[in-house]
Amino acid sequence: MKTLVILSSILGDRSHSKQLADHLIQRLRQHEPDGSIRVRDLAADPVPYFDGATAGALFTPADQRTAEQAAIVARSDALVAELFDADRIVFAVPVYNFGLPAQLKSYIDQIARAGVTFRYTAQGVPEGLLKNKQVVVLSARGGKAEGTPADTLTPYLAQVLGFVGLVDPVFISAEGMAMGELAAQDGLALARQRIDALVAGAPQQVAA
């Protein structure tokens, strides 16, 4: 399988979400020696914010774009092409102030494109076009919020990923990262166990 791993933490190797991603990558290489893994680090190589210039470029007909607009669209096209090419897409996401990092939001704004990754049917029903992908979200947070109203990350990502066709994401979270060393170790250990089970093929609960 072709796996695309998208990192979004600003902390580099100190990031707990990256540590989970590294663990998953290690397990995948063991279980799928013939597979390929591509990593995109949104902090090391940021995606530009979706601004007026970007919107203008995307909504200008291809034969009328300036050279600058063509470059903007080409950058977005490259991000989208990675998604279509992958069989499995992994998002490593830290929770910042109850939400996702700005880097990941910028990425989502660049790849959620009408007529490209989603469309509306004649009946006005949205249809995601990134189909038949395995989707995994590895998150880490300082406190504990899974299954409570304070967890705003899970419903948002389930909604926006599903909108572009990335349905039934498996969420694996390491919680309690800022609640002391023992709590952090326990949270990471539990998340790694779930990653091991996922790679081994054990059934996983997906977001509702």
Curated annotation (Swiss-Prot):
User: What is the designated name of this protein?
Assistant: FMN-dependent NADH:quinone oxidoreductase
* Highest taxon of the lineage: Bacteria
Q: Which HAMAP family match?
A: Azoreductase_type1 (MF_01216)
Q: What is its EC number?
A: 1.6.5.-, 1.7.1.17
**Per the record's keyword annotation, is NAD included, yes or no?**
yes
Record organism: Bordetella petrii (strain ATCC BAA-461 / DSM 12804 / CCUG 43448)
Which residues belong to the signal peptide in this entry? none
Q: List the keywords (alphabetical).
A: Flavoprotein, FMN, NAD, Oxidoreductase
Instruction: Name the InterPro entries on file.
Output: Flavodoxin_fold, Flavoprotein-like_sf, FMN-dep_NADH:Q_OxRdtase_AzoR1, NADH:quinone_OxRdtase_FMN_depd
Instruction: Write out the function statement from the record.
Output: Quinone reductase that provides resistance to thiol-specific stress caused by electrophilic quinones.
Record GO terms (molecular function): electron transfer activity; FMN binding; oxidoreductase activity, acting on NAD(P)H as acceptor; oxidoreductase activity, acting on NAD(P)H, quinone or similar compound as acceptor
Q: What is the lineage of its organism?
A: Bacteria, Pseudomonadati, Pseudomonadota, Betaproteobacteria, Burkholderiales
Required co-factors: FMN
State where FMN binds: S9, S15, H16, S17
Which reaction is catalysed here?
A: 2 a quinone + NADH + H(+) = 2 a 1,4-benzosemiquinone + NAD(+); N,N-dimethyl-1,4-phenylenediamine + anthranilate + 2 NAD(+) = 2-(4-dimethylaminophenyl)diazenylbenzoate + 2 NADH + 2 H(+)
